[in-house]
């Protein structure tokens, strides 16, 4: 018996150790005394109750187990089982905002009726083999092509009903057009996960996320969120906050406002991400004071802590690693981005890079893909990189947290350093204590 090579162990200030397994998602807290006893049991090959409990969560494995080979099997099974389809659809590539850090070029307009027809055929053809269909609406600003969203959504719901599919539909919108009528229309076609971005409080947000003619947007978004709060329907509404060194100090003021609006309504939540430099056509990104790679996780955890302290729900915050939890959708063989002209991409960022354009949807609703390009996105295996193969986080990303980073900049796409995960585990542990929850010696799978 031995400790799993995919364990991450983090020491807390009160002396507890947090053990987390990146393959099984098992997490437990043990005292320093228990941790020493576990090591002694393993040295003596003693099957104690605590060792048997750790075995259940994969934190302890038998000596002969090849964990990398087992991971390879599980990763391949999860990626290639083929019973799901993930489409990220751009109903238009135009936008009513001009954000300082935007990487899009707005060269294409709204999706034509012909392209809509092809997408409907695509889903109908795939449906008999599917258990699950996931559709994300992206842009540009997708609500500028509201009719396209409604038309395709009605068709997808019919297909769902005919074939008994699990169906999930979500939208990423700047929120400017998301008034009461629009919210109700989206909910009527089962678009129940909505993400809107607000980058700090009023002044900083309006400097980063303004209308095409330069107008302000913060107050309209705040009003639309208040209007959504008044609805009785079921949905999940997430406010994404992108941060840099200049707007981060204003985020607490935004959180105070959101606390006042949400009023402990658990349909609403927040999450935080650093602003990244993905290029852009106007060079505005170069005027922003971006946080360094080393500061991103500490800042994110601090903001999450501030949100939790106000009673806000944190969606997509730090979570303990698990199998493929950091894997990018672009690395999945059954995930496609569909442009407004029917072009197929793997990534929603690098639309103007040829390696990202992998094919198109043909007139019969078939996916016509360039296999060579597809292989570049989905064919890379984590055990092929000697550095990744040695990493305890390998199960969570399988060296594909960002395939674009490996393809475009030839860099290793690490989602987080192990030290950052340890910091995150300490944050989770402290959050439990701060909420009055007892951390027990237990393994949760």
Set out the residue ranges of the language-model regions.
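N-terminal [4Fe-4S]-dependent radical SAM core
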Residues: 3-29, 48-88, 128
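Flexible mid-to-C-terminal extensions adjoining Fe-S/redox cofactors in radical SAM and related proteins
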Residues: 3-6, 351-445
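Short, acidic, Ser/Thr-enriched surface-loop or helix-capping motifs
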Residues: 22, 338-339
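Short, charged low-complexity linear segments at domain edges
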Residues: 63-83, 312-322, 357-387
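Conserved alpha-helical substructure of the radical SAM core
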Residues: 69-184, 189-192
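Short glycine-enriched, charge-decorated loop/helix-capping segments at active-site entrances
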Residues: 105-109, 207-215, 408
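Active-site beta-loop-alpha junctions enriched in small/polar residues
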Residues: 140-142, 174-176, 199, 242-244, ...
